[in-house]
Amino acid sequence: MLQEDVAQPRRHLLSRRSFRQRSRERDDRGWTLLHIGARKGDLKELFQVRRLLDEGMDVNVTAWGPKAQGATPLHLAAQGGHLRVMDELLERGANIDARTKGACGWTPLHNAAKERNKEAIKFLIESGAFLPPDINDHRFNPPLHYCPGLEWAYEIKRLQDESFSSSDTTCTSEN
């Protein structure tokens, strides 16, 4: 047996036929195939994400590994800035404000902010991500802490709130 075969990390479970057949299994990071597809985010993976969701995989399945305590596929897609995957997950009912467990308690918005991914941040806010001025992780750090240039995100949210409140009309029905 070659040393390369022994040293091959368990992360290559996707290429193993038995792992592909059992979509509920996890790799050494605690990730399912849905997590892997969301993290990679390319077109091929988007089709895999759709297939897994069509087969009944929970869109909010959490990863339980040493570095991914409670991360959902949406956390990983936001971290990578994969807008099409994020859109698919949200359409299927992903919790846009899901928090990781452990010390941080990050939302997908925190993940996108840490990566300074402006498109992902804008997409999450426009999709309804919770963005009060005091949104903090468990260390009391707001997304601004991880991305100092995020002030524009609060401005987008403020403009959205203003346009929503100004377009509020009351409907009356006449009998």
Each predicted region: which residue ranges?
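Ankyrin-repeat junction/capping positions
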Residues: 24, 60, 64, 97-99, ...
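Intrinsically disordered, low-complexity regulatory segments in ankyrin-centric signaling systems
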Residues: 1-55, 64, 161-175
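Ankyrin repeat domain, specifically the short helix-to-loop turn at the C-terminus of the second helix
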Residues: 17-20, 50-58, 87-95, 122-130, ...
